[in-house]
A protein has these predicted regions:
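Acidic, low-complexity intrinsically disordered segments
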Residues: 1-102, 108-109, 115, 353-357, ...
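Glycine-rich beta-alpha loop elements in corrinoid/cobalamin-binding modules
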Residues: 1-47, 286-334, 341-355
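Acidic/polar loop patches that form or flank catalytic/metal-binding clefts of enzymes
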Residues: 8-14, 36-39, 131-134, 161-165, ...
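A glycine-rich phosphate-binding loop feature that marks nucleotide/adenosyl-phosphate handling sites
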Residues: 17-31, 138-143, 167-173, 236, ...
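Active-site lining segments that contact anionic ligands and/or coordinate catalytic metals
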Residues: 24, 64, 82-86, 94, ...
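Glycine- and acidic
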Residues: 82-86, 98-108, 130-139, 197-204, ...
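Conserved SAM/AdoMet-binding glycine-rich loop
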Residues: 122-273, 277, 281
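Radical SAM enzyme core and accessory elements
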Residues: 310-437
Length: 437
């Protein structure tokens, strides 16, 4: 902003302003990079013009406690999806799931102090009037002071009738002490994300979670009075087989058995919700070279799982295929897709994230008019030697680390979390050499 003000005062040209802006660490100026393509459509070269860095390195907030935190939120007059206070405990993730873009690009881990979080929570509730608060992060239960924070907020939440909720939890560190603190307010359901139906596939994606971890957490929850559990999985993960798909139904049945074993009050019954999404390869992850399975194959796997879900108390929800296909196309796309997006918009495509507005036919017509094949982006396996459209951007994680993780996935070898062992991903360079794990 200061540079733009200076440009206006001194009468710079647009190009001069952009060149100066490119000198600011973390600023990417697309027009200062020339991209050439091979005959097969892959990227041949990405050349930085004079004044632009060859690779733009992401900038991060160094100290979360010193960063501005918005507690005076705008409260809309209509009901919205995120109708609550959302308290971010820390940024980054220690886990390293190989499919997760956020887990890579938000590295390194940087925690907020427990005392400041308590103050932020009180201010946000008092200023907004919300009666629901979510303690959010990529893996909330990995916050090192979570139990202490819940203790600090316990009396305040009880007095203000505020429900304290956690998003998807790690089943391998879910504790009874944590559950008891959640029970102080209005009880809500619990959500776990095993992601895959077999141990082999969970190891391949580096989930570092066993079925027994999940079942033990469910037993504790059911014994503590919970009667609703949501389980999140993905279909189409690299190396997935029908056995892995059917393993999801097996896990749901085992969770049902855990409820029968552990629930103290069975009169209310149990609600187990299994939700599956479609794997979308994302840039800057260990699976950025992987293809998305074709729509027909995804729908076959959904049908296979749906037919295997024959337990009355288990509800199965799945993500529609057309929107996930287009998400993969755009996620793995290059700058040529800009014209496609504009063409689709001119055809009337707006608010495409909503199924009511999304029209795959309009998108396919736009691709045809622009002479591009969407399957080239979504369903093609990429060589690790290929220049990727996002190669001029670095999130701090070394490309060699991603290649190593990619290879380990096919070997079924897991990588320990950052708190257990530093895996030398390279993201520590963003915070002076030491992560806050």
């Amino acid at each position: 902003i200061e540079l733009h003000r200076q440009a206006r005062r001194e009468g710079w040209s647009k190009h001069e302003f952009l060149v100066r802006a490119a000198q600011i660490p973390g600023v990417y100026v697309p027009s200062l990079y020339d991209v050439a393509y091979n005959d097969d459509g892959t990227v041949k070269s990405i050349t930085a013009n004079e004044g632009a860095p060859k690779v733009v390195l992401k900038r991060v907030v160094q100290n979360m406690d010193e960063a501005y935190y918005p507690t005076k939120t705008i409260v809309p007059s209509t009901e919205i999806v995120q109708d609550r206070v959302s308290l971010e405990l820390f940024r980054g993730c220690i886990r390293g799931c190989r499919f997760c873009q956020a887990g890579y690009v938000y590295r390194p881990v940087r925690n907020r102090s427990e005392k400041l979080l308590r103050d932020y929570a009180v201010e946000a509730v008092e200023d907004s009037g919300y009666q629901d608060m979510t303690l959010s992060s990529l893996s909330t239960s990995d916050y090192p002071h979570l139990v202490e924070l819940c203790d600090d907020l316990e009396d305040f939440c009880a007095q203000r009738h505020v429900t304290l909720a956690l998003p998807s939890l790690r089943a391998d560190n879910f504790s009874m002490a944590l559950m008891e603190r959640l029970q102080k307010g209005r009880k809500t359901g619990l959500t776990f994300a095993p992601e895959a139906g077999t141990q082999r596939l969970r190891d391949a994606i580096n989930k570092n979670l066993t079925e027994e971890d999940l079942l033990e957490s469910c037993r504790r929850a059911f014994a503590g009075g919970y009667s609703a559990v949501k389980l999140y999985f993905m279909l189409g993960l690299p190396t997935e087989t029908d056995e892995d798909v059917l393993g999801i139904a097996d896990i749901a049945a085992h969770v049902m058995h855990a409820w029968r074993e552990s629930a103290l009050n069975k009169t209310r019954g149990v609600r187990i919700t299994v939700s599956t999404s479609w794997f979308v390869p994302k840039p800057h992850t260990a699976f950025q070279w992987e293809p998305q399975i074709p729509i027909e194959e995804y729908e076959r796997r959904v049908k296979l799982l749906r037919e295997a879900m024959n337990t009355k108390s288990v509800t199965y929800n799945w993500h529609p295929s057309p929107t996930s296909f287009m998400e993969a196309v755009i996620s793995c796309g290059d700058r040529r897709l800009g014209k496609v997006i504009e063409t689709a918009w001119r055809k009337g495509e707006t608010l495409s994230a909503w199924e009511d507005y999304f029209d795959l036919n309009r998108w396919m017509e736009a691709f045809e008019e622009c002479g591009l094949d969407p399957h080239f982006y979504a369903n093609r396996r990429r060589s690790e030697d290929e220049i990727l459209p996002w190669s001029m951007i670095s999130c701090g994680v070394a490309p060699g680390y991603l290649k190593r993780e990619h290879a380990l996935s096919y070997e079924g070898v897991t990588t320990p979390d950052c708190r257990t062992h530093c895996n030398a991903c390279g993201a520590n360079c963003l915070v002076g050499g030491k992560c806050d794990v």
